[in-house]
């Protein structure tokens, strides 16, 4: 049985979501693969510089920035993070090598940025026969060294720009794979069969009003308060569903506003697809996951693009504009006129039409890509072997689909 290890961390929710979604689908497919998840942050806990300096783990500090909306300082923090990773590169590689020596695998799939040079070197040193795949969970890279590095072996990207970035770095075309979008949980492909009218009524909403869903990832954002206040005093006829994630304090502050417009405020929920099925449009952060989830449910989006936008997400607003699947606002303090524009029948119909035409099946495209990679890696190992007998190129015939 072939072993696949998916490397993730919990800085932001998107990396874990991608890892768990891929594990679920890979195990459902007809491949004899054993799939394991590796939380890199736990493995690197002995050298977590942030925890040693502040008592706060790196991933917790990052998530705190998201909750507080302190994202304006992320470019400076990225410089510090890159420097720290370079400083500890040798120790990180050794910890990874130790892990691989105890938990060997045939393919390593990274769904995280920053650490891919360390991962590539540790695999080359400890498991030279293993394949190393980097799957971007962003629509584009933020060079240098964010997602793609010279040492990257195989790259899976979800946009034409990311593919061109990989090619411009000199990566061979045969090792670059473009999917139709971002990896989403399988649940986003199984839309709930519900009576929207009855469900809206049950949640205290009106069945006849345009309904927006407001989301800022798994930890919410203070920007949701600004949106609630602005929308509540706007002349636009609509209602909102707020999903606050793990930010219970934010949910309480929203409830304390006592909005005059109908609203529903939820804390953390695993029923995001259910709430999206009740909505007509999306308002939130320009994260690749949030945008892609909304589009999967046919929702045009309104996202913010300014100096507070995290560097790796700055292309996303441009992507939304180019695809004509939503509107971009410079600041949510100006959301009222943008909402008015979106709710014009002609504008909404055009955006909705473009959203419906956008098809993303990335989660179901990745298994065949990985199967191809493992087949290619096995053949390369055979071709570069010093003797014909050192590697059996057909040892994996069953998993490779060879006959």
In which residue ranges do the predicted regions lie?
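Acidic donor-binding loop of glycosyltransferase active sites
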Residues: 277-290
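A nucleotide-sugar donor-handling region in carbohydrate enzymes
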Residues: 153-211, 216-217
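Donor-nucleotide binding loops and adjacent catalytic segments primarily
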Residues: 194-201, 205-278
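Active-site and donor-binding regions of nucleotide-sugar-utilizing enzymes
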Residues: 18, 68-171, 175-178
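Short hydrophobic beta-strand element within catalytic cores of glycosyltransferases
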Residues: 282-284, 300-310
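Conserved N-terminal ligand/cofactor-binding loop architecture of enzyme catalytic domains
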Residues: 21, 25-103
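C-terminal amphipathic helix plus adjacent low-complexity
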Residues: 346-403
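C-terminal "capping" alpha-helix adjacent to the active site of nucleotide-linked donor transferases
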Residues: 321-324, 330-347
């Amino acid at each position: 049985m072939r072993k696949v290890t998916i490397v993730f961390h919990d800085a932001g929710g998107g990396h874990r979501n991608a890892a768990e979604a891929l594990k679920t689908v890979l195990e459902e497919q007809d491949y004899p693969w054993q799939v394991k998840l590796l939380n890199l942050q736990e493995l690197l806990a002995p050298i977590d510089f942030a925890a040693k300096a502040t008592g706060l783990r790196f991933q917790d500090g990052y998530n705190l920035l998201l909750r507080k909306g302190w994202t304006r300082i992320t470019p400076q923090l990225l410089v510090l993070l890159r420097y720290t990773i370079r400083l500890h590169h040798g120790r990180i590689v050794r910890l990874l090598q130790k892990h691989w020596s105890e938990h060997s695998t045939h393919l390593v799939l990274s769904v995280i940025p920053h650490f891919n040079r360390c991962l590539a070197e540790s695999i080359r040193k400890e498991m030279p026969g293993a394949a190393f795949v980097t799957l971007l969970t962003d629509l584009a890279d933020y060079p240098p060294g964010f997602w793609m590095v010279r040492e990257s072996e195989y790259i899976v990207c979800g946009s034409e720009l990311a593919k061109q970035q990989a090619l411009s770095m000199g990566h061979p075309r045969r090792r670059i794979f473009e999917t139709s979008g971002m990896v989403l949980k399988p649940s986003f492909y199984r839309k709930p069969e519900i009576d929207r009218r009855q469900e809206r009524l049950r949640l205290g909403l009106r069945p006849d009003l345009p309904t927006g869903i407001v989301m800022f990832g798994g930890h919410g954002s203070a920007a949701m308060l600004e949106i609630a206040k602005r929308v509540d005093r706007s002349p636009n006829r609509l209602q909102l569903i707020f999903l606050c994630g793990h930010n219970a304090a934010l949910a309480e502050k929203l409830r304390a506003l006592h909005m005059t417009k109908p609203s529903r405020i939820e804390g953390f929920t695993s029923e995001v697809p259910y709430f999206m099925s009740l909505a007509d449009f999306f308002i939130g952060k320009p994260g690749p996951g949030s945008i892609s989830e909304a589009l999967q449910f046919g929702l045009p989006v309104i996202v913010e693009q300014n100096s507070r936008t995290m560097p790796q997400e700055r292309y996303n607003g441009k992507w939304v504009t180019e695809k004509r699947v939503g509107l971009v606002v410079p600041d949510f303090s100006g959301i009222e006129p943008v909402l008015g524009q979106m709710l014009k029948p002609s504008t909404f119909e055009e955006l909705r039409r473009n959203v419906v035409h956008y098809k993303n099946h990335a989660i179901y495209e990745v298994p065949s890509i990985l199967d191809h990679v493992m087949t290619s890696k096995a053949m390369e190992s055979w071709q570069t072997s010093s003797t014909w007998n050192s590697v059996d190129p057909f040892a994996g015939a069953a998993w490779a689909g060879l006959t």
